[in-house]
Amino acid sequence: MKFLGVKVYRFPLVKYYWPFFVGFGLTFYGVAKIQNAMMDTAEFINDPRHPRFKKGDLEKK
């Protein structure tokens, strides 16, 4: 059976690989939180590449 050109297999993918999907989600979330925390440290808060400059917040913090 094909759906939008993709072959459908009858293998229960989620049943066997759910720990990997959960691990990916937790890792992605953790890395994003660490990245945001590192961006707001004293060393990088006034870097012109900081996303707050794109928002128009030019005050030094």
Swiss-Prot record:
What's any one GO cellular component for it?
mitochondrial inner membrane
Instruction: Spell out the InterPro entries in the cross-references.
Output: ATP_synth_F0_jsu
| Compartments (UniProt record) | Mitochondrion inner membrane
Q: Where are the transmembrane segments?
A: 13-32
Q: What assembly does the database describe for this protein?
A: F-type ATP synthases have 2 components, the catalytic core F(1) and the membrane-embedded component F(0), linked together by a central stalk and a peripheral stalk. The central stalk, also called rotor shaft, is often seen as part of F(1). The peripheral stalk is seen as part of F(0). F(0) contains the membrane channel next to the rotor. F-type ATP synthases form dimers but each monomer functions independently in ATP generation.
- What family does the Swiss-Prot or TrEMBL record give for this protein? Belongs to the ATPase j subunit family.
Q: Could you tell me what this protein does?
A: Mitochondrial membrane ATP synthase (F(1)F(0) ATP synthase or Complex V) produces ATP from ADP in the presence of a proton gradient across the membrane which is generated by electron transport complexes of the respiratory chain. F-type ATP synthases consist of two structural domains, F(1) - containing the extramembraneous catalytic core, and F(0) - containing the membrane proton channel, linked together by a central stalk and a peripheral stalk.
Question: What is the protein's name according to its record?
Answer: ATP synthase subunit J, mitochondrial
Source organism per entry reads: Pichia angusta
